[in-house]
């Protein structure tokens, strides 16, 4: 009987050790804890297709600089991210009626500080003008009397609609397009003399489609990119996210993601 009891105790000890080993392996490999990740609260992020910041990968899932930054930043705060494609013109309405939790899509904070609660900046981006390689447009002042294409509700649109107070010349026509992909077609086909957008997005398009545009040396502005939450949001998530951005900038995470 004593031998039997000793055998039971030994078996119990071995089972306990095996259980500890499994738990230790789970701790050492948190990325495999799918059930834990699935239990995390979800943040719904609204964006639109804008390579290299946000676009659909070959597997059909959202990818890009903003997607990776959002996944890392919200992950540090204990959230799981779900990116949804939105009508960019309705972004403010969507965040205010809680259809989405925030707007994250290479979104400029400048001039919009009072419209939203902001987290950031997490990056800085130049808003620039691009022309065809054979164009005689060399400076911003050369845009006088020309046709320029922009995406509607963006910072370049705002700058050109208020051209005089922003030190920009009077255009012959400003095309404000809902679909930003049409910007490049409009310029390529000669319907516009120039387009204005984030420099990184223009360079990504040229790389993806082997197209050569010339970017003017003088930028329209250098924009602070941030994450926009509803103005009336009642918690401190925007401030928490700003603090995480500061950590990610300090520890090199942002630089690592952007340089991939």
Q: Across the structure, where does each feature detected by a protein language model lie?
A:
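A ligand-binding cleft/hinge motif common to bilobed small-molecule-binding domains
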Residues: 90-93, 106-115, 159-162, 186-221
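Extracytoplasmic small-molecule ligand-binding "clamshell" domains
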Residues: 34-106, 176, 240
């Amino acid at each position: 009987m004593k031998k039997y009891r000793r055998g039971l105790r030994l078996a119990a000890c071995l089972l306990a050790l095996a259980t500890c080993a499994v738990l230790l392996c789970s701790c050492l490999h948190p990325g495999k804890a799918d059930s834990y990740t699935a239990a995390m609260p979800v943040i719904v992020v609204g964006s639109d297709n804008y390579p290299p910041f946000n676009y659909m990968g070959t597997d059909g899932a959202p990818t890009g600089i903003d997607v990776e930054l959002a996944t890392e930043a919200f992950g540090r705060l204990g959230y799981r991210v779900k990116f949804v494609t939105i009508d960019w013109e309705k972004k403010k309405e969507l965040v205010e009626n809680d259809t989405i939790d925030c707007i994250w899509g290479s979104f400029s904070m400048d001039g919009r500080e009072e419209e939203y609660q902001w987290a950031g900046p997490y990056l800085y981006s130049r808003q620039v003008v691009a022309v065809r390689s054979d164009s005689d447009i060399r400076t911003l002042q050369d845009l006088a009397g020309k046709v320029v294409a922009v995406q509607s509700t963006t910072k370049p649109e705002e700058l050109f609609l208020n051209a005089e107070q922003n030190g920009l010349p009077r255009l012959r026509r400003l095309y404000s397009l809902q679909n930003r992909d049409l910007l490049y077609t409009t310029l390529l086909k000669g319907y516009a003399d120039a387009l204005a957008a984030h420099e990184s997005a223009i360079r990504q398009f040229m790389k993806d489609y082997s197209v050569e545009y010339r970017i003017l040396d003088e930028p329209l502005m250098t924009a602070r990119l941030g994450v926009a939450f509803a103005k009336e949001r009642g918690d401190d998530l925007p401030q928490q996210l700003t603090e995480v951005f500061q950590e990610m900038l300090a520890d090199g995470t942002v630089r690592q993601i952007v340089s991939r």
